[in-house]
Every structure is written in structure tokens, then in C-alpha cells.
A protein has these predicted regions:
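C-terminal cap of thioredoxin/glutaredoxin-like
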Residues: 1-3, 9, 76-195
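Structural alpha/beta surface segment adjacent to cysteine/selenocysteine redox centers
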Residues: 1-96, 192
Length: 195
């Protein structure tokens, strides 16, 4: 029944004024930004790394580059226009969390675009313009309207929210509950031949 689940990506920035700094990793940035020790920042990110590992993800915060995400969000909206947003997001997350790539760098975004089959000449023109900036800003505005203050943040069927790095079971339970309720409210929609 997972065919009835639609994933919608939305843009959000924790630190919209953050300057990209390829010489600084995310542990260093977090320590400075939160006013905590580097050791404490590493502990916090190690917790997230361990949660990610439980679901088969590899996070390398020691090499994750401090990068403003606005251009990456514009790239994601461009990819959405061509039906490639899921692939774009997966590649962006891998580039940032695993591969230590600068996701604010146009060349990095062009490489990802090429990997997922986007027209890189059109993508380059988009990234060198302000195209999709309004889409990103609209998503951020919507997030503020519903009370988003951190990432990750997930909304299920516009009813249930899961915030922060949570155990996989929290997502499973929320997804199952929201889908069961949706199915009950939409009898005949999920499977028109079954009533």
C-alpha cells in the first residue's frame, strides 16, 4: 500500500545568514553557533550519526562542510520541476552528510544534476540567476507558519509532526497511524475497487 504515499520535500533554513565556509566542518560551526565546546558539539552529532547508522545511513560530520543551503534548495525546486526531486534530495544529503562536498558550490550542484539526468546548461543558468528563490522563501514562510523551528521536521498527512533526530520506530508508528486514518477517511480512494 506504499503506492499511496506521496513524499513532498519542503525547503527550510536553520541559519539563513550562515556564510559558506569550506574550511570549517559542521562540528566546529555548531560549537561556535551554540556557544558549546567542540567536544559537546561532536557528542551531539555523534548521537545523530548513530541514529542514522541504525537505518543504514552514513554521516561524517567531521568532513561535512559548513554551507548555506539556499542554492541547494533552489536546485531541489529545479529538480522537482523535472520530476527528479527525490533523486536530487538523496544526492544532496549524500554529498553533504557523507561525502563532505560543498552543497553551496555551483559545480557540486551541476555534478549532482548531471548524475540524476538534468540538463546542466539549463541548471547552470538557473543557479546563476535568482530563479526558484521565491519557491524556497514560500516554503520557509509556510514552515514558520506551522511552527517549524528545527530540522529534520516531518509532517504526516498534514496532521502529525515528528521533529528532530528520532528513532526509526517513531517514524514507523506515525506513518502507520496517519496512513490508517487517511485510508479510513478516504474509503474507495486508495483502492477504488474495494469498498
Amino acid at each position: 500500500e506504499s503506492d499511496n504515499i506521496e513524499l513532498i520535500w519542503k525547503s527550510y533554513q536553520l541559519s539563513p545568514n550562515m556564510k559558506t565556509n569550506p574550511d570549517k566542518n559542521i562540528n566546529q560551526y555548531l560549537a561556535e553557533h551554540k556557544g558549546i565546546s567542540l567536544e559537546r558539539a561532536k557528542e551531539m552529532n555523534d548521537h545523530v550519526t548513530n541514529l542514522a547508522k541504525q537505518v543504514g545511513l552514513v554521516y561524517n560530520f567531521d568532513t561535512a562542510i559548513v554551507a548555506n543551503s539556499f542554492n541547494a534548495h533552489r536546485f531541489s525546486h529545479f529538480a522537482k520541476h523535472y520530476g527528479k526531486q527525490n533523486e536530487a534530495e538523496e544526492k544532496l544529503f549524500a554529498a553533504y552528510f557523507t561525502e563532505g562536498k560543498n552543497t553551496d558550490d555551483i559545480q557540486t550542484l551541476l555534478e549532482i544534476g548531471e548524475e540524476i539526468g538534468l540538463d546542466t546548461s539549463v541548471l547552470k543558468a538557473v543557479l546563476e540567476s535568482n530563479k526558484y528563490a521565491d519557491d524556497v522563501k514560500a516554503d520557509i514562510y509556510e514552515a514558520h507558519q506551522i511552527g517549524v523551528r528545527g530540522v529534520p521536521f516531518f509532517v504526516f498527512d498534514r496532521k502529525y509532526a515528528v521533529s528532530g533526530a528520532q528513532d526509526n520506530s517513531v517514524f514507523q508508528q506515525t506513518l502507520e497511524q496517519s496512513f490508517a486514518e487517511w485510508k479510513k477517511e478516504n474509503v474507495g480512494v486508495a483502492h477504488p475497487d474495494k469498498k
